[in-house]
Amino acid sequence: MEPVDPNLEPWKHPGSQPTTACSNCYCKVCCWHCQLCFLKKGLGISYGKKKRKPRRGPPQGSKDHQTLIPKQPLPQSQRVSAGQEESKKKVESKAKTDRFA
């Protein structure tokens, strides 16, 4: 590498200027597009997948966040529907009649 004169401004250092001239749409010095192309070409808009944020852990103060919920027994239905009893009787009666056939 060539030694750089410390008295030179940074934009005058060798290699700091673009090799090609700036176009009327895109400036290589400032890397900005004109407003028309920015809106027309949709520059700066990406429809790609967004990165998910990592899940946060439990709060620092509590050891287990589920200890606050009191445990209750699950409700059990004691009643048996009449439709089930009738269907059982029909199956039993069919089984008895088929046995003799």
Swiss-Prot record:
Compartmental location: Host nucleus, Host nucleolus; Host cytoplasm; Secreted
Binding site for Zn(2+) 1: C22, H33, C34, C37
PTM comment: Asymmetrical arginine methylation by host PRMT6 seems to diminish the transactivation capacity of Tat and affects the interaction with host CCNT1.
Any GO BP annotation: positive regulation of transcription elongation by RNA polymerase II
Motif residue range(s): Nuclear localization signal, RNA-binding (TAR), and protein transduction: 49-57
Cross-link (Glycyl lysine isopeptide (Lys-Gly) (interchain with G-Cter in ubiquitin)): K71
Record-listed N6-acetyllysine modification sites: K28, K50, K51
Region of interest: Interaction with human CREBBP: 1-24
Region described as Cysteine-rich: 22-37
Site (Essential for Tat translocation through the endosomal membrane): W11
Residue numbers spanned by region Transactivation: 1-48
Keywords linked to the UniProt accession: Acetylation, Activator, AIDS, Apoptosis, Host cytoplasm, Host nucleus, Host-virus interaction, Inhibition of host innate immune response by virus, Inhibition of host interferon signaling pathway by virus, Interferon antiviral system evasion, Isopeptide bond, Metal-binding, Methylation, Modulation of host chromatin by virus, Modulation of host PP1 activity by virus, Phosphoprotein, RNA-binding, Secreted, Transcription, Transcription regulation, Ubl conjugation, Viral immunoevasion, Zinc
Region (Core): 38-48
Residues that bind Zn(2+) 2: C25, C27, C30
One CC-aspect GO term: host cell nucleolus
Annotated stretches, region: Disordered: 1-20, 48-101
GO MF, one annotated term: actinin binding
Asymmetric dimethylarginine found at: R52
Taxonomy, superkingdom: Viruses
InterPro entries (UniProt xref): IV_Tat, Tat_dom_sf
Biased composition (Basic and acidic residues): 85-101
Oligomeric form and interacting partners: Interacts with host CCNT1. Associates with the P-TEFb complex composed at least of Tat, P-TEFb (CDK9 and CCNT1), TAR RNA, RNA Pol II. Recruits the HATs CREBBP, TAF1/TFIID, EP300, PCAF and GCN5L2. Interacts with host KAT5/Tip60; this interaction targets the latter to degradation. Interacts with the host deacetylase SIRT1. Interacts with host capping enzyme RNGTT; this interaction stimulates RNGTT. Binds to host KDR, and to the host integrins ITGAV/ITGB3 and ITGA5/ITGB1. Interacts with host KPNB1/importin beta-1 without previous binding to KPNA1/importin alpha-1. Interacts with EIF2AK2.
Further comment: HIV-1 lineages are divided in three main groups, M (for Major), O (for Outlier), and N (for New, or Non-M, Non-O). The vast majority of strains found worldwide belong to the group M. Group O seems to be endemic to and largely confined to Cameroon and neighboring countries in West Central Africa, where these viruses represent a small minority of HIV-1 strains. The group N is represented by a limited number of isolates from Cameroonian persons. The group M is further subdivided in 9 clades or subtypes (A to D, F to H, J and K).
Comment block on domains: The cell attachment site mediates the interaction with ITGAV/ITGB3 and ITGA5/ITGB1 integrins, leading to vascular cell migration and invasion. This interaction also provides endothelial cells with the adhesion signal they require to grow in response to mitogens. The Cys-rich region may bind 2 zinc ions. This region is involved in binding to KAT5.
Stated family: Belongs to the lentiviruses Tat family.
Protein name: Protein Tat
